[in-house]
Amino acid sequence: MSAVSRIATLTRQSMLSALSDNNRLRLFSGSSNPSLSQEVARYLGMDIGPMLRKRFADGELYIQIQESIRGGDVYLIQPCCHPVNDNLMELLIMIDACRRASARQITAVLPYYGYARADRKTAGRESISAKLVANLITGAGAQRVLAMDLHSAQIQGYFDIPCDHMYGSPVIIDYLKSKQLTDLVVVSPDVGGVARARAFAKKLNDAPLAIIDKRRQSHNVAEVLNLIGDVDGKTAVLVDDMIDTAGTLSEGSRLLRAQGARQVYACATHAVFSEPAINRLSGGLFEEVIVTNTIPVPDDHHFPQLTILSVANLIGEAIWRIHEESSVSSMFR
């Protein structure tokens, strides 16, 4: 049985057809990941709503919703990935346009939440940008947020509106199970990711857990110090929420191999892939790098070990459940 329970397709499509006629449930896509939005729309059996998007000569963005959404339940899909500032501003303008068009309910769907790592002060006179982004989204007029794999769970509490939290792990776990790997050990790349790795291991038939003790010297620079757990002769699965420069994972893979790991897989929901991630990931340290399509991966960032899985059905199911006032959290139990 799939990780996502699904309402019968024909029933759903017939219901959505009637709903769409009344402009009740409407789906719109920003420009950051249109292919994901189209997949979500196909799952729901509906079309992406028409929207005019253009830039003025000075770089300012113009958005116009090109159909009536008065009284509608509107969902705006826009991961705030690179270029994060442009994509965030586009989302805010989309929300504002829908609010001024008298949408009954506006849900910001954020497959990737930009600025999530700035979730607390680690030094004096710093901004907590993750909270600022939450304030901006709320202030623009969103009444609900649907986010996937937030860097830290407490970001949900930064919102004064409902925030539904999804996880990309079900599609990754289903894929790993299909490979029938043996002698698995799930590895957290740092102490902060232990809860995520433990939940991941539980879904993989209670696989054993190992932890890499890491101390970060500066932003995007990590030093691996020690391994807690046994990986000798085993297939190690490194689990994280995102891959940025891949420094943590590549150093982790070296440590795991030095400790006797037979194979090393890297799994993450968000493929940020900042330089020099591609060189690190494609250099032979990993049997496979498994990510999802919350962030679009350009063709020139593909490499032989890369596998990209779709989370569109998860997002589509969550949207449907919110619209029907059903449980979202039960999808991930």
Curated annotation (Swiss-Prot):
Gene Ontology BP term (one): ribonucleoside monophosphate biosynthetic process
CDD domains tied to this protein: PRTases_typeI
GO molecular function, one term: kinase activity
Pathway in which the depicted protein is active: Metabolic intermediate biosynthesis; 5-phospho-alpha-D-ribose 1-diphosphate biosynthesis; 5-phospho-alpha-D-ribose 1-diphosphate from D-ribose 5-phosphate (route I): step 1/1
Binding of ATP, residues: 58-60
Enzymatic reactions: D-ribose 5-phosphate + ATP = 5-phospho-alpha-D-ribose 1-diphosphate + AMP + H(+)
UniProt function note: Involved in the biosynthesis of the central metabolite phospho-alpha-D-ribosyl-1-pyrophosphate (PRPP) via the transfer of pyrophosphoryl group from ATP to 1-hydroxyl of ribose-5-phosphate (Rib-5-P).
Protein name: Ribose-phosphate pyrophosphokinase
Protein source organism: Synechocystis sp. (strain ATCC 27184 / PCC 6803 / Kazusa)
Highest classification ranks of the organism: Bacteria, Bacillati, Cyanobacteriota, Cyanophyceae, Synechococcales
